């Protein structure tokens, strides 16, 4: 005789879920061991790959930079490596000094000149073009907030005739962060009266062991996770030690208000301020990414002009130069930053905008 529905045995759903999870874990475990057997050396060592990557970055940065209470970090005075010289005052070398009021250049790694030698940076090439001393105050990894603060810190010291503030769109996003690549930084909050500085004095860099998330502490030991993320080109996010304090998009408002501080610096110092937009090389590879980067860039340049600052966008010049030479804009980069030719083009644009002699 058939039993009523209420009396029929129900499937053991929790048990089935546990069996599926157990099978999944066993499968992942087999894949992990198989991958470690393939690479062999990792069969006997089980490092936390995230911690190792962050430790290497921290140790490398300790040699190249020193802590700064206002900016987070600045180049270490006197540091030298093949093709790279940091002067006694913490600026990258641009060559022999020349008399007269200098030009001050501030920015991120594109201004500093990552991936090229001292004479190939655009500040050094600007000095060669104009015959005017150009001070390279660029610093790798800076956000637009740090770039502006750097300009405010250096202008009273060097009393430049002009200040060139260069940026890429990602520098705008960086203003939304409190920590980038393991290093704490100053940032700004927004209130009804404008910008409010936060995280100042900036705390020293934290021990990388203290900033790992639960997932990084747990799955950071997995070679399988590391391998998969490497194939997906997602290791930067997995390894990266970043701390966000503002919702995505807030940086555009912050950066716009920061151009007001640059306008005040222009008034107080008497130095003409020129904003220069450069571009991440990925812009030339992905149209959707390019559209967003250009939108952010054009918005910030519009803010600069509204505050009475001169501003130039290098996008069209990079495109036109490449077409003229029968190449692509990507040819003006090493890997992630401008090469010698790309920096020469930027230097020429700056010289022309400042109404200085250009080749």
Language-model segments: residues:
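Conserved SGNH/GDSL esterase-like catalytic core that processes O-acyl groups on lipids
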Residues: 104, 112-205, 209, 213-214
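N-terminal Lys/Arg-rich, disordered targeting/topogenic segments
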Residues: 1-13
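Membrane/wall-proximal cationic-aromatic binding patches
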Residues: 40-128, 318-333
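Generic structural signal for small/hydrophobic residues in well-ordered secondary structure
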Residues: 32, 108, 147, 163, ...
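Histidine-centered active-site loop/cap adjacent to the catalytic His
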Residues: 30, 330-359
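Hydrophobic membrane-insertion alpha-helices, especially the h-region
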Residues: 19-34
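Serine-dependent acyl-ester chemistry module
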Residues: 168-301, 309, 314-324
């Amino acid at each position: 005789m058939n039993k009523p529905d209420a009396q029929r045995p129900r499937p053991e759903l929790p048990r089935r879920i546990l069996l599926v999870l157990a099978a999944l874990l066993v499968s992942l475990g087999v894949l992990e061991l198989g991958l470690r057997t393939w690479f062999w050396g990792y069969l006997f060592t089980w490092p936390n790959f995230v911690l190792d990557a962050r430790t290497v970055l921290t140790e490398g940065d300790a040699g190249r930079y020193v802590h700064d209470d206002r900016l987070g970090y600045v180049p270490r005075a006197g540091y030298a490596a093949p093709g790279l010289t940091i002067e006694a005052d913490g600026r990258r070398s641009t060559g022999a000094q020349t008399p007269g009021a200098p030009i001050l250049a501030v920015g991120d790694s594109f201004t500093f000149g990552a991936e090229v030698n001292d004479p190939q940076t655009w500040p050094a090439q600007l000095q060669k073009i104009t015959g005017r001393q150009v001070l390279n105050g660029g610093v790798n990894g800076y956000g637009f907030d740090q770039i502006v603060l750097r300009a405010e810190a250096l202008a009273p010291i060097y009393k430049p005739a002009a200040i060139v503030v260069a940026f890429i769109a990602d520098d705008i996003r960086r203003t939304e962060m409190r920590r980038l690549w393991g290093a704490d930084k100053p940032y700004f909050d927004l209130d009804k009266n404008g910008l409010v500085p936060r995280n100042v004095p900036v705390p020293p860099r934290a021990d990388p062991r203290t900033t790992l998330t639960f997932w990084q502490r747990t799955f950071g030991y997995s070679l399988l996770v590391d391998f998969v993320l490497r194939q997906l080109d997602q290791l930067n996010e997995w390894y990266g030690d970043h701390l966000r304090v503002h919702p995505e998009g807030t940086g555009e408002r912050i950066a716009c208000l920061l151009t007001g501080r640059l306008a005040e610096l222009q008034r107080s110092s008497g130095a003409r301020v020129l904003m220069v937009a450069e571009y991440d090389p990925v812009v030339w590879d992905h149209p959707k990414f390019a559209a967003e980067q250009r939108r952010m860039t054009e918005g910030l340049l519009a803010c600069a002009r509204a505050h009475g600052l001169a501003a130039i966008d290098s996008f069209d010049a990079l495109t036109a130069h490449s077409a003229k030479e029968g190449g692509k804009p990507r040819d003006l980069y090493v890997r992630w930053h401008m090469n010698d030719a790309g920096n020469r083009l930027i230097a020429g644009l700056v010289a022309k905008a400042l109404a200085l002699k250009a080749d």
